[in-house]
Amino acid sequence: MIRFLGAAFAAALLLPVASAETVQLAAADGVKVFGEVWRASGAKPPIILAFHQAGSSSAEYAPIAPRLAQAGFTVLAIDQRSGNGAFDGTNRTAAELGRKATYEQALPDLEAALAWAKANSHGAPVVVWGSSYSAALVFLLAARHPGDVNGVVAFSPGEYLANKTAVRDAARKVDVPVYIDQASGADEVGQSAAILEAVKSTDKQQLLSPSNSTHGSSTLRADTNPAGAEAHWTAVLKFLKRFMPS
């Protein structure tokens, strides 16, 4: 599959990857949001904003973001206020906040990341990428900021919010390319399909997962999905190539 990625995209795979740098953002309600940035080489690389699943942090993307950066994308992965220490990480935002937060209450953190992307993209495309509950929130984010989001990647989205139609309602306003992946269980596949059907854009796709898959973005991690991660990588990189400069 890699032979179809195109010359510019394939060349980006050979570029060196910088180490992650820590950033601090300010949400609209004053909450301090911590994150890590992996910067791609080259002029005006597209940006991926990577959001984690429940009980997690930016550490979910520690083995994922460097590969995306090597493929030519600058990646910002944040610690949302709704999260914890999965994947051997520490959620600095939640720790400093000092109280539990609902999934919906994390939306300002995603908006802070989007504001960072607007200030740093220099006109390059911005892709919002969610995992589990944040895969639900990225549809709300894209619906609220239609001029600022160029693509949506959602791993294991579902109607996880208090309003059980909120994600589909938002998806009906999303008119940018959308990619959905999920674990192979019937419930996850069904929830993903319902959300994808609601998406306004006609440029949308769902990976009907192979048997080797795990929940959320962790399906790309070799430590959690050793037998299946590469199949998911092939599919998502093929989708992402449209955002690379020609």
Predicted regions and their residues:
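Positively charged n-region of N-terminal signal peptides that target proteins for export
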Residues: 1-4
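Bacterial N-terminal signal peptides
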Residues: 6-16
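Serine-hydrolase catalytic machinery in alpha/beta-hydrolase-like enzymes
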Residues: 24-39, 44-120, 215-218
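Second-shell loop/turn segments in exported
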Residues: 54, 95-104, 160, 179-185, ...
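Primarily recognizes the serine-hydrolase "nucleophile elbow" in alpha/beta-hydrolase
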Residues: 113-173
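The feature captures the conserved acid-bearing segment of alpha/beta-hydrolase catalytic domains
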Residues: 151-211
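C-terminal catalytic histidine-bearing segment of alpha/beta-hydrolase fold enzymes
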Residues: 204-246
